[in-house]
Amino acid sequence: MSSSNWEKLKKKLDSAKSGRVEKKHSNEKKYLKSVKGKNNENENSYIVDKKRMNELKKFAKENDIPESQVLDAYGVDASKLTRKTNLETLGKYIAMDCEMVGVADDMSVLARVSIVNYHGHVVYDTYVRPKEKVTDWRTWVSGVKSFHMRDAPSFEKVQAEVAKILDNRVLVGHAVHNDLKVLLLSHPRRMIRDTSRFSGYRKLAKGRTPGLKKLAEVILGRDIQSGQHSSVQDAQATMELYKKVKKEMDEVAFKGLSKS
C-alpha cells in the first residue's frame, strides 16, 4: 500500500476515535477488496501480510482504536491469524493465553490460542474449531464469534503446532495450568513461570490468586479485559508481569529444580 493511499486512509479514520470505524468510502472499499484478494491467494496459510497488519495495528494504536475493529473494518479476516513462525527466532521465553467457549454439560473447550515472545511480539495466534457443538460462544468475554470458525484449523493441528513451539522453552502464563489443560498438553514444571502463583503478586490479593486484570492495572498501569478479552493482549500483559520479577521467579524455579 503506497504512503499516499495510507495518508488518505488515515484521514478517513480520524473520525473513528470513538471506537467506530467507517467503511463506506470508495478508497476504503478498494483497500478492503485488495486485502481480501491477497489473503485468499493461499487459503491454507492463515498468514496475514505482516506489513499490512503492522500498518493497521500502528494506526489503531495511534488513534486509540481497538485493533480488532480496525482489522475487521479493513478486511483482515480474523479467522486467518498468524499460525506459522520461524521457531529459531522465537527465543527462549514465550507467553501463552487461551480463550474458551462453552459446550454441553457446562464444559469449556479451546477456541483461540495466542503466543507472544519475550518482547511481546505475536508469534502464533489462531482460532480453533471445536469438535463439540458450541452452546455458548461467550462473545461478551471471549471475543469469539461463530464466523471465526469458518476457516479455523482443527484442535489436533493446533495442539501439534503449540506443542512444537513449547518444546524446550520457558512457558509464561497466568494460571497457565488451565491453558495446558484445555490443550491436553503438559510442560516440565521447571520450564513454567506462572504469574498467578508468584508470592509477590499474591500479596496484592491478600494471599489469594490475583486476577490478571488487577495485576495489569496495578503493576503495569494498563487497562485490560474491560470488555471482550483478547488472548493476545492477555499474553502480552502476562509476559510484562513476568519480566518485572523475572529474577525472583527464575530463582524460585531453580530452587524447585535443585530440590527435585
From Swiss-Prot:
One annotated Gene Ontology cellular component of this protein? nucleolus
Which InterPro entries does the annotation name?
Exonuclease_RNaseT/DNA_pol3, REX4_DEDDh_dom, REXO1/3/4-like, RNaseH-like_sf, RNaseH_sf
Q: Which UniProt keywords apply?
A: Exonuclease, Hydrolase, Nuclease, Nucleus, rRNA processing
Query: What are the start and end residues of every segment in region (Disordered)?
Result: 1-37
The protein's matches in SUPFAM superfamilies, at most eight in alphabetical order, are given as: Ribonuclease H-like (SSF53098)
Residue ranges occupied by any Exonuclease domain in the UniProt entry: 93-242
Q: Which organism is it from?
A: Schizosaccharomyces pombe (strain 972 / ATCC 24843)
- EC number(s) on file: 3.1.-.-
Protein name in UniProt: RNA exonuclease 4
Q: Which GO BP terms sit in this record?
A: RNA processing; rRNA processing
Any idea what job this protein has? Answer: Exoribonuclease involved in ribosome biosynthesis. Involved in the processing of ITS1, the internal transcribed spacer localized between the 18S and 5.8S rRNAs.
Q: Which GO terms describe its molecular function?
A: 3'-5'-RNA exonuclease activity; exonuclease activity; nucleic acid binding
One Pfam annotation reads RNase_T
Entry-linked PANTHER family: RNA EXONUCLEASE 4 (PTHR12801:SF45), RNA EXONUCLEASE REXO1 / RECO3 FAMILY MEMBER-RELATED (PTHR12801)
> Which top EC class is given?
hydrolase
